[in-house]
Swiss-Prot record:
Pfam families: Ribosomal_S2. This is Small ribosomal subunit protein uS2. It comes from Corynebacterium jeikeium (strain K411). GO terms for biological process: translation. Residues 227-256, 267-277 have a biased composition (Basic and acidic residues). GO terms for cellular component: cytosolic small ribosomal subunit.
Length: 277
């Protein structure tokens, strides 16, 4: 079954690129034609690249990896948050903090601080003994951290891969991922550089419907990866149980000749006695 159909891509406007005067020549191979000063992306290629990205994400998750969703532009914020939350993956949809990957230890300290503030707010007596001004300052600090780091609050290590909507907008995230050899899966509009992406999906990164559709496909791959992982674990458990059941039977077969040994010895003794007679 196809991951997505050509009709779905067309309906979402995935084929619309940027104006012909705003383009990256490296994207030429992904362009089908231009119409009224707008580049039209070759959706046949898009379908092929979607399949490749889907399989990569699926296998990454199947092996226990996680995907960090990144999209801070207005058109991508809702899709990134909704789809990441749907499949329980971390996300950044407001502002990318420099060093979020390359200096994750420092970010982890801020995450710890965020959890402290959240626990304080959740406790009945969390603000006991503090003035109204102090409570206000702590609340502002918590809100700021939640806005910037809320999507990665449960992330304990750097991600296995990134899903990015608009690599130009998220160029810092792309650069950090490259430094750490973290694979990047991303929508490539006609003004993007395909050389910085490991698993490109040629498409419209400005339209909300396009961002929604392509991000939902990545989430479907995450779900498929989780299912594959569960199936593999179940198969491994059954195999281990089967090996455990075989062990006693093999032990019994190994002990059987020892039990038969006395009878064989008696037969040999009788034979020797008859010979002497």
């Amino acid at each position: 079954m196809a991951v997505v159909t050509m009709r779905e891509l067309l309906d979402a406007g995935v084929h619309f690129g940027h104006q012909t005067r705003r383009w990256n020549p490296k994207m030429k191979r992904f362009i089908f034609t231009d119409r009224n000063g707008i580049y039209i992306i070759d959706l046949q290629q898009t379908l092929t690249y979607i399949d490749e990205a889907y399989e990569f994400v699926k296998e990454t998750v199947a092996h226990g990896g996680n995907i960090l969703y990144v999209g801070t532009k207005k058109q991508a914020q809702e899709a990134v948050a909704n789809e990441a939350e749907r499949v329980g993956m971390p996300y950044v949809n407001h502002r990318w903090l420099g060093g979020m990957l390359t200096n994750f230890q420092t970010v982890a300290k801020r995450l710890h601080r965020l959890k402290e503030l959240q626990a304080m707010d959740a406790a009945e007596d969390g603000y006991k003994g503090r003035t109204k001004k102090e409570v206000l300052m702590l609340t502002r600090e918590r809100n700021k951290l939640e806005r910037v780091l809320g999507g990665i609050a449960d992330m304990t290590k750097t991600p296995s891969a990134l899903w990015i909507v608009d690599t130009n907008k998220e160029h810092i995230a792309v650069s950090e991922a490259q430094k750490l050899n973290i694979p990047v899966v991303a929508i490539l509009d006609t003004n993007c550089d395909p050389d910085v992406v490991d698993y490109p999906i040629p498409g419209n990164d400005d339209a909300i419907r396009s961002a929604n559709l392509l991000t939902s496909i990545i989430s479907s791959a995450v779900e498929a990866g989780r299912q594959a992982r569960a199936e593999r674990q179940e198969a491994a458990a059954k195999e281990a149980a089967g090996d455990a059941d075989k062990a006693p039977a093999e032990a019994e077969r190994t002990e059987a000749p020892a039990e038969e040994a006395p009878a064989e010895a008696q037969s040999e003794a009788k034979a020797e006695g008859n010979t002497e007679a």
